[in-house]
Structure formats: C-alpha cells, structure tokens
Amino acid sequence: MVVVTGGAQGIGRCIADEFRRSGASVCIIDCQEGDHFVGDLSDKPTLERFAQSVVGQYGRVDYLINNAASLMKGIDECTFEEFQYALSVGVTAPFYLTKLFAPHFAEGAAVVNISSSRDRMSQPQTESYTAAKGGIAALTHALAVSLAGRVRVNSISPGWIDTKAMNYTGPDATQQLVGRVGNPADIANMVLFLCSDKAGFISGENICIDGGMTRQMIYHGDFGWSFRG
C-alpha cells in the first residue's frame, strides 16, 4: 500500500503510475481535483482525515512518498503567509503524515521524500521553495534516525525534470552532463528502487538525480558565459 502526496500530476503522477504497474494499491492526496483524496496539505485536519481514510481502508502503509511541491516565490514578493504556506506543504506535511502513519507502517516500510537540487544551490527569488526543499532534506536524516529499525527514510533531489512531455534540445539539453533534460520516470525509477529490498542497506541518504548538473563548475569565460553583475 503506497501513499503519494501531490500524485495527481508531474513527478508524483508518474510515481503513482509506476507503483500501480508493479501491482501496488496507491492512495493520492492532491489539491488538484480528480479521482483521489482532494485536500490542502497545509491544513492539519485535512492531513488527519486523509490518514484516517488510508488506515481505515487498508490498515497499513508500506511506502510513503512525500512529493507535493510548495510555491516558489522570492524575498522581493513572498509574503509572510506565503512563506509559511510553502514550509507547511514542503516540510510540516511530510513530518506530520509520517507521524500519523508511524503506528501503521508495515514491516519493511520506507519513506521517500522528494527534495530538489535547490536544497544545495539557488537562483534569485526562490527563497520559499528552496527553504522548503532544504528543510525536507534535513528532515529525512532526522526521521531516519528516529525510525531506525522500523522504517527506512531517504530523499531524492531532482534537477531539471521535464514534466510536460516536451523534448528540449539545444542548450537546454547539452548543458546537462548526460546531454538531456530529465523526465519523471528518472525519479520514479529511483523511488521504486529505494522502496525495494535491493535498497535495504540505504537509510538517511539523499540521492541527487540531475544529469550531473550540480557537479559542473562554470567560471566567467567558460563556454562563452559571462557574468553581468
């Protein structure tokens, strides 16, 4: 039995589809309307109702995938309330769902948190999203220690992932060390691996899947690039 937050679209939908193809039952919570539990992940009573629904229907949780993304706004425009909302969706909800499901995790259970390569690097005006992704990356190893012996907890940091089924070419692709932009299946495949027995010796770890983008150092003058301060 698999729970996927933000599973109605993008990476989350691909993760849910891959689990279903493997024969698993999947419960999704998403703010987008559809044939799943619809609700706001920043709302405590909503999280509690969702958890009660899952446990009432299945009695256990094998895998929890905290995938839902928070809003991206920067210091110039992001309000206090928006920043708080980003952290509620991106950090508090994963923590609270893990807490709610803790008594109901099955033997061999796993939690996979979807962070971002922005947990280690930034663009201007992305503070709300970057802070949330950095928070869930740190939450991962904290939960792994607290749940040791019961649940394995890991996180994945995707880089540039094309969630619109478009084929980017030219500089968008060649700037990646692997020569292409990522796709949702690149992330879903790792999620399923981390939930499998093959990953039984992995916990508290973060895996960056970004085509090598964060490993490439670029200086002024490299590849025709120049800095404009």
In which residue ranges do the predicted regions lie?
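Canonical Rossmann dinucleotide-binding motif of NAD(H)/NADP(H)-dependent dehydrogenases/reductases
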Residues: 1-26
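Conserved NAD(P)H cofactor-binding loop of Rossmann-fold oxidoreductase domains
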Residues: 67-72, 212
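Substrate-binding pocket helix/loop in short-chain dehydrogenase/reductase
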Residues: 74-87, 172
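Active-site helix of classical SDR
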Residues: 98, 132, 140
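Alpha-helical segment proximal to the catalytic Tyr-Lys
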Residues: 103, 144-149, 200
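C-terminal helical subdomain
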Residues: 155, 171-202, 209-211
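Short C-terminal tail/terminal secondary-structure segment
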Residues: 203-229
